[in-house]
Amino acid sequence: MKKILKGVGFTFIAVAVLTVVSGAAFAKSLTVGVSWSNFQEERWKTDEAAMKRQLEKLGAKYISADAQADSSKQISDVENLIARGCDALIILAYDADAISPAISRAKAEGIPVVGYDRLIEDPYAFYLTFDNKEVGRMQAREVFKVKPEGNYVFIKGSPTDPNADFLHEGQLEVLKEAMDAGKIKMSVSNTPMVGSPRSLKRTWSRS
């Protein structure tokens, strides 16, 4: 991991990617390949539209692939984006560990890689994200305002997503005092095998 940038907007992401690949922020005729982990989560559809708009606004060509929550498919997707002539890659990793072969392939081709939102443990990949621990704190503060006592159910994100741990750490920081005092009890702490709305609903119903 070369760099962590937190709380960044899509304009900054687009400029950063073009700067990494070309040395000039407003480079023209560059193709940026984006590998998305899945579009089951509505957020990624929104992010894609914003990212595509900003890259094209800066003169870059946008191409993408949806891994459909499949780590093997994501590796194939990245290889396909490379074959299509991308000059830089943005990867939202479905599995931060399993994506390693794709990073190695990009490195061999001399193609810069930016890990978007989810940490890729590879020194070749830059890392762009939000302050996920602070997001967890914000979530906990708002819930605590509404329910300062009682049983809490924590449904963490996918085990393949490092951000799930950061969010949970932030939540526990805010709630620790109340938990130590016995005002809040962690009745269940579950991690769905797949971070999709359907799996989350199943986990919630079992809690």
PLM features per residue range, with description:
Residues F10-V21:
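Bacterial N-terminal signal peptides
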